[in-house]
Amino acid sequence: YFGQGVRVLYLDTGYELGHTAYDSLNLIAQYDFVNNDENTANETDQEILENQDNHGTLCLSVMAGYAPGNLIGPAFKSEYLLAKTEIMAEEIQQEEDNYVAALEWGESLGADIACASLGYLDWYSYEDLDGNSAVTTIAVDIASNLGVLCINSAGNEGDDPWYYIIAPADADSVISVGAVNRDGT
């Protein structure tokens, strides 16, 4: 089984779909919530191009990539909805609004799963991450109640001094995924 019959919404920075690992990607729809168009790759008329699609391309490949002998993602036969939600130049609250809009869009197109390796922290305190306050946390709970299985990274903070999960990983209806290095850090 390789994900047949499952529709996945993937939210991230953007995607370089010209990569050979995506030659057989079953792309149903894509939308750029940053620039309000249907191109989730780099666009030459955008102000910030650097690494615009790097994170999204890499993360999506873990799930959907198919390049025998190099990479085979576990769900390369799923149907995909791709949403570009992140503004690379800075961390701003608009990204959370984009995330929410993408969840609504994906749910309206029949997404079974919503997956993101994104999170929001800069404008929240530890106390705000209570599972009920962050905009994306509330949206993930609503999407889950509508039947969308939501999966999100626990955080993207790396070696930063913040050692807690970030929104929307604090939602009670999300599967939150984290990792540590070999030495436990």
What do these predicted ranges mean?
Residues C59, Y99, L103, S108-T185:
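Catalytic-core segments of hydrolase enzymes
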Residues Y1-E95, L109-D112, N145-G147, D170-V174, ...:
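Subtilisin-like serine protease catalytic core
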